[in-house]
């Protein structure tokens, strides 16, 4: 009410609610005579016009409320990716961005707090450390900023500079750190222990959790466009030391990512047959992703896949396919249960926002002639 004072006016609220009720009651009639798309456009135009008269809320606020409300009626994974969220969405799928390479969050009192610099990034080499508080960006105070505000100001074109004013517990005075923005690679693959950082800024991993018995370890934190290539690079590093006698693939707390990447990684361990299929709400098969024998580079390696309640979507495809084909042993806890496919559509010609719409469900490969399981969470299910 402080931000939008008209919301505290009871007369205006009642008038607004009456208008919304009228539109809702009229909707079935309009749909009988006009196409659904045209009906909704006309309704939205009337609502926006009424808002100008009654509540006078910013158009962006109203559109977001109606947009999020509409998507919430579908399922938990269908959503609008708004302009202020699109950058983070793109980063999660592309696996890279331009910036200085710091992970930040909002502190207990609203300050912009550094969680950690990314290995090999400008922030890493520039002296930023965990628990630093960013008080200014290019001289502008961060007081009252959200994390998104800070990201907007800190990121920019590659090769340009940004000055962060840092408050550090071990220093009496603030520090000004000028960093040059660069392309930051978000690695989704790591080993058992980070031994050092290379001259190019890449972490050097110890890939053997048990050197004596030659048991390798690879942790995968997401399924981005670069994850498959990163796993192949890790495998080459393993083999340079010696041929492994087994591999642990750690998918704990991996929320998933890109379906094609899940298929590629599954195929490393599976020589033939289905990896995952997709079906619509009627149970009709829409696709069947299958393994290629010439890409099953690791099919002969003994494999253990670690999962927990934080393993979802693409993680469940990989672990489920490995289990169905007997290509490895699954160890851990019941996974999250996110077995739906979202297709992404641009909103508008300039694609400043996106719509994620659930269109399919995953089905794992059949086991012993029985139909494969749907991955999607079901109330009361124990598997």
Q: Which sequence ranges carry the predicted segments?
A:
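Conserved functional hotspot residues or short segments at active or partner-binding sites
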Residues: 363-383
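Cleft-lining beta-strand/loop regions that shape enzyme active-site pockets
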Residues: 49-50, 54-58, 82-84, 95, ...
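C-terminal "exit" segments of structured domains
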Residues: 342-343, 349-365
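A generic structural motif
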Residues: 105, 165-169, 363
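PDZ/PDZ-like peptide-tail recognition elements
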Residues: 65, 76-116
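A short, sequence-level motif marking secondary-structure junctions
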Residues: 179-185, 360-362, 381-382
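Terminal targeting/pro-maturation regions of precursor/exported proteins
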Residues: 1-78
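A structural signal for short hydrophobic beta-strand segments in well-ordered beta-sheet cores
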Residues: 6, 102-104, 206-207
């Amino acid at each position: 009410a402080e931000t939008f004072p008209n919301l505290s006016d009871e007369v205006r609220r009642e008038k607004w609610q009456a208008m919304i009720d009228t539109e809702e009651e009229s909707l079935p009639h309009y749909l009988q005579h006009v196409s659904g798309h045209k009906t909704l456009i006309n309704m939205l135009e009337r609502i926006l016009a009424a808002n100008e008269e009654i509540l006078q809320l910013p158009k962006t606020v109203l559109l977001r409320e109606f947009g999020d409300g509409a998507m919430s009626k579908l399922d938990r994974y269908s959503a609008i990716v708004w302009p202020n969220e699109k950058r983070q969405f793109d980063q999660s799928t592309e696996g890279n961005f331009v910036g200085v390479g710091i992970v930040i969050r909002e502190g207990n009192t609203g300050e912009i707090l550094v969680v950690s610099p990314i290995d090999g990034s400008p922030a890493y080499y520039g002296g930023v450390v965990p628990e630093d508080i960013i008080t200014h960006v290019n001289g502008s105070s961060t007081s009252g900023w959200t994390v998104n505000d800070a990201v907007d100001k800190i990121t920019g074109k590659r090769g340009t500079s940004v000055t962060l004013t840092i408050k550090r517990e071990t220093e009496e005075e603030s520090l000004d750190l000028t960093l040059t923005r660069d392309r930051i690679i978000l690695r989704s693959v790591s080993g058992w222990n980070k031994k050092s950082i290379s001259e190019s800024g890449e972490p050097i991993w110890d890939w053997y959790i048990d050197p004596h018995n030659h048991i390798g370890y690879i942790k995968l934190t997401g399924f981005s466009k670069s994850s498959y290539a990163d796993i192949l690079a890790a495998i080459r590093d393993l083999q340079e030391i010696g041929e492994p006698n087994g591999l642990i693939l750690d998918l704990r707390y991996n929320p998933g990512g890109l379906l094609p990447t899940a298929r590629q990684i599954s195929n490393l361990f599976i020589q033939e047959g289905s990896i995952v299929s997709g079906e619509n709400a009627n149970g009709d098969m829409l696709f069947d992703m299958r393994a290629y024998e010439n890409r099953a580079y690791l099919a002969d390696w003994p494999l253990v896949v670690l999962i927990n309640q934080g393993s979802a979507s693409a993680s469940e495809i990989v672990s489920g396919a490995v289990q169905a084909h007997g290509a490895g042993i699954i160890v851990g806890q019941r996974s999250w249960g996110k077995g739906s496919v979202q297709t992404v559509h641009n909103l508008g010609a300039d694609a400043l926002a996106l719509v994620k719409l659930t269109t399919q469900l995953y089905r794992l490969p059949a086991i012993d002639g029985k139909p494969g399981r749907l991955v999607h969470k079901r109330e009361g299910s124990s598997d």
